[in-house]
């Protein structure tokens, strides 16, 4: 009887936790900047690479290609979140690998927090897994770089 009462009290709480942990597609929408953690000192470096996940299910990745500040879209297409940890991107345009056009790319992701996205994937036709880390770009005043006071 005590076990039954315990289960009746705990089961709904476990269900609430599962619901709270589920990732909603809206939480991925926005502008993300790629970062890289230095292997020597652990410092996080901002890369000149951004990904835009739009509410209409389209995405694009762009970067600054040279010191003059020229930017280009490197990849674009559509995306769909298939579960709490998987996105499938359908590539409709790519300057980095034109053979990807028309193909699907499965991304395994994890939100470390609301503003940090960790992604791993294998590009179609490749055997090595890639790992990326992205941070959300927000409407806020720029922070001072570390070391400048």
Q: What positions do the PLM features span?
A:
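Short, conserved beta-turn/loop elements at beta-strand boundaries and strand-helix junctions
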Residues: 82-87
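Bacterial Sec-dependent N-terminal signal peptides
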Residues: 1-25
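Lipid interaction determinants
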Residues: 16-74, 88-149
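Conserved hydrophobic positions within beta-strands
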Residues: 32, 79-81
């Amino acid at each position: 009887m005590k076990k039954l009462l315990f289960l009746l009290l705990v089961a709904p709480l476990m269900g609430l936790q599962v619901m709270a942990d589920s990732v909603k597609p809206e939480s991925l929408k926005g502008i993300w900047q790629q970062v890289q953690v230095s292997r020597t000192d652990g410092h996080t470096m901002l890369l000149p690479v951004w990904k835009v996940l739009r509410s209409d299910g389209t995405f694009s990745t762009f970067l600054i290609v040279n010191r003059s500040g020229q930017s280009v879209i490197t990849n674009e297409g559509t995306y769909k979140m298939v579960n709490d940890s998987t996105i499938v991107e359908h590539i409709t345009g790519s300057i980095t690998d034109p053979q990807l056009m028309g193909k699907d790319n499965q991304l395994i992701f994890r939100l470390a927090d609301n503003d940090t996205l960790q992604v791993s994937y294998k590009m179609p036709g490749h055997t090595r897994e890639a790992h990326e880390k992205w941070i959300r770009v927000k409407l806020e005043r720029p922070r001072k770089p570390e070391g400048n006071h």
